[in-house]
């Protein structure tokens, strides 16, 4: 599908391991199945609760349009986006940092950081899997629970 820069399945390995900081937000630590990626993500747990060992599909896209064209830059309440209907939880945010792994052991590791209205995400893994990310790019996060 056009506009998608990342798509993988993740398994929740822990929830709020450092304790719960906010009433309606949980921090989830997840591991990917296909690309050996690590995901740390804050989610509004009142709207979309997850628990340990849940499996989710995570898609990161630059647009919600099926044709891949950029969004208009304004919210259109009449717009229909079939991509949204395929998922249970959707957020809009911005990539604010890309960071190389300086450990020197694996060499090709990269971490992408994004903020979705203050809910943070870190996606870390092989740089080849994060090649479409740029600082200050707008990003849609689409998620749904799945069995795999």
From Swiss-Prot:
The cross-references to Gene3D superfamilies, in alphabetical order and at most eight, read: Nucleic acid-binding proteins
Database matches in InterPro entries: NA-bd_OB-fold, RPABC3
Question: Which GO BP terms apply?
Answer: DNA-templated transcription
Pfam families reported for this sequence: RNA_pol_Rpb8 (PF03870)
| This protein's GO CC annotations | RNA polymerase I complex; RNA polymerase II, core complex; RNA polymerase III complex
Q: Which residues cross the membrane?
A: none
* Subcellular location(s) of the protein: Nucleus
| UniProt key word Transcription | yes
**Where does the signal peptide begin and end?**
none
Query: What's the superkingdom here?
Result: Eukaryota
Q: Where is this region: Non-specific ssDNA binding?
A: 16-40
Task: Give one GO term, molecular function aspect.
Answer: DNA-directed RNA polymerase activity
State the family named in the UniProt similarity comment for this chain: Belongs to the eukaryotic RPB8 RNA polymerase subunit family.
- Subunit structure, interactors included: Component of the RNA polymerase I (Pol I), RNA polymerase II (Pol II) and RNA polymerase III (Pol III) complexes consisting of at least 13, 12 and 17 subunits, respectively. Directly interacts with POLR2A.
The protein's role, per its UniProt record: DNA-dependent RNA polymerase catalyzes the transcription of DNA into RNA using the four ribonucleoside triphosphates as substrates. Common component of RNA polymerases I, II and III which synthesize ribosomal RNA precursors, mRNA precursors and many functional non-coding RNAs, and small RNAs, such as 5S rRNA and tRNAs, respectively.
Q: What is this protein called?
A: Probable DNA-directed RNA polymerases I, II, and III subunit RPABC3
> What's the source species for this entry?
Caenorhabditis elegans
């Amino acid at each position: 599908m056009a506009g998608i820069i990342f798509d993988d399945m993740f398994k929740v390995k822990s929830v709020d391991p450092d304790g719960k900081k906010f009433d309606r937000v949980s921090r989830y630590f997840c591991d990917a199945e296909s690309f050996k990626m690590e995901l740390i993500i804050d989610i509004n747990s009142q709207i979309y609760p997850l628990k340990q060992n849940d499996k989710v599909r995570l898609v990161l896209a630059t647009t919600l349009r099926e044709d891949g064209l950029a969004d208009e830059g304004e919210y259109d309440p009449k717009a229909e986006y079939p991509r949204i209907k395929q998922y249970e939880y959707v957020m809009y945010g911005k990539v604010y940092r890309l960071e190389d792994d300086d450990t020197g052991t694996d060499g090709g590791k990269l971490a992408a950081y994004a903020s979705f209205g203050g809910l943070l995400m870190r996606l870390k893994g092989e740089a080849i899997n994060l090649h479409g990310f740029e600082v200050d790019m707008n990003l849609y996060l689409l998620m749904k629970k799945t069995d795999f």
